[in-house]
Amino acid sequence: MIPGDIAAALGVRASGTWRPAPAGVGGAPGTYATSLAFRLADASGRVPGEVAAGLAAALEPVPWISAASITRGGYLTVTVTPEALAGLAVRVPAAGAACADSDALRGTELNAPAAADPASAASWDEARRRLAAEITGRLAAAAGAKVKVKDYSERWCHCGLPALAGAVAFAGPGAVRYALARTQPGRQAAIDAAACARNDLGNPFFAVRYAHAHAASVLRWAADLGLDRGLPETFRPDLLCHPGERELLGVLSWLPERAAAAARRRRPDAFARYLEGLAAAWLGCWERCPALPFGGRSAPTDGPQAAARLWLAAAAQTALRTGIGLLGVAAPERLHAAGSGGLYESPG
């Protein structure tokens, strides 16, 4: 989201050039680095450092950008204001299912297979390849590509691998789909059905869905207490200043870029790992600066700070629900972790 905002302020397409700023160059939430100047320099025959200087100068009058600097001969590092980063807490829920959308792949066309039962694949590798192509289609569509979904089932063997069918029967199709989706190309695709069926935070499939359900339960709990986020116009971005909140906002700010990058590289496993990082950021934020009191921990229960934290919970839930859906998996609103000792028990 934020990298797209910066590109829009420059009036250029910069998809595929953004990276988190490296340590030592302001690598904190709200700071972004781009190699855009090198791309533009190649096209124009100019020196990258000169192009980067022009880009930095163009950003000087933008009120929500606090700094733009040049490093390593042409890399542009941009820092947005804390208020701009915190504003994602309102922007993400407002965008809803479109919060992962961008125009990064606008003008691209591709075919993608319709969703199919993973148990019908003749091998683990075939199941992974099929699923990767299906998810890539959804990610590409979110990034602005024109995607034609086609039914290729007549080309596929329908006998199915017994081990795959057994894994689906034991762990469920969602768990198997997620485990295959996060498997890197070239790695053995066979999965441990028992491991991906565990209801604990050590299981990535459970963790991302649990984080979504946890954020949803926070919002339900707040409603039961009569608490309200209020209108977007009353939101106070300056109140989301805790390091845990800023870390979560920093991860949220990359959602459209991570979806587009995974589509471009045909690597849904990279997007699954992004979601796992987002889930961890939300649960870490809740532990360090909860939106509501729990387990003896204090938290504001009314006023603008409580409202700001509830907006952030809504942003986390919206982003997780959207991302999990792009992987073709359901995002439940009620889910409980086994053996969590209360720390991560659903608050409502």
Language-model-derived ranges and their functions:
Residues 1-348:
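Non-catalytic interaction-recognition regions
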